[in-house]
Amino acid sequence: QDRKVAMVYQQFINYPGLTVYENIASPLRLMGKAQAEIDKAVRQTAEMLRLTPMLTRKPLELSGGQQQRCALARALVKGAGLVLLDEPLANLDYKLREELRIEIPRIFEASGAIFVYATTEPEEALLLGGNTATLWEGRVTQFGPTPQVYRLPADAQTARVFSDPPMNFVTCRKESHRLTFGEEAHAPAHGATAGLPDGTYTAGFRANHITLNRHTGDAVEFRCTVAATEITGSETFVHLSHGSDRWVGLVHGVHPMTAGAQTSVFVDPAHVYLFDSAGRLAAPAPYAMAA
């Protein structure tokens, strides 16, 4: 309270026996505020969070999204300068998560507070984060503006954490002006990769940069075994085996494929990152530098 820090958790923390109005008012009552000040603050906060029509209802009469907005209102009403949100959308169904993802940036802007938002979903970080810190095994691996962290991951762990599905990796050897991926796929070394010392690297590329057709003349072709497909409607997740590596491709459209079938997939070298033997970024994907 004295530090003006508030927290919102994955579980909806509301008093079930109190109305939405009284839930929002409860922190101010504990602070000993006057009733007129409480009423003004509650109604302003309820308006910001679009809870005004629900003020006389109790939490169990609300949808999951409304309950979470009520919990957020309780955090914001006391004028906290720092609000910590610990996976606040994790317990909501898909539709409610999508609705609140649209609402939360507006709430951030209207409140004027600093928000620290913890999530395991890269998509949420990209949608909601002005700055992003990526964590791996309790250690911050990178911090910076969200688009920059996504496009220019400092190391392979950051690239893995900040990709959904996780970034795909394959061993790559650089010899003179040529890159060899795995045992059979080749591409010329361009841009930042051309200036790297010869040696062994780890190449990384995201799921959405795998295609089923050759779209560019220098696209790298990989022969893979289909492990499974997941068709979501407008997109298909293709799970692939490439030697001992396990990859996931995300391709547009419906592409049913038989498990165990052999197939070729393609990756544009412009979307390939190279990491050194310590996992540090050695050469960013050329597209990332052009963005």
Segments predicted by a language model, with ranges:
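A generic structural motif
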Residues: 173, 230-232
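Active-site beta-strand termini and strand-to-loop segments that position acidic
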Residues: 240-242
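C-terminal boundary and immediately downstream tail of ABC-type ATPase nucleotide-binding domains
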Residues: 151-175, 204, 268
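ABC ATPase nucleotide-binding domains
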Residues: 2-6, 10-157
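Short aromatic-glycine-enriched beta-strand elements
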Residues: 235-238
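Glycine/charge-rich catalytic "coupling/switch" loops of P-loop NTPases
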Residues: 178-230, 256-291
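Short alpha-helix capping/helix-loop boundary micro-motifs
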Residues: 248-251
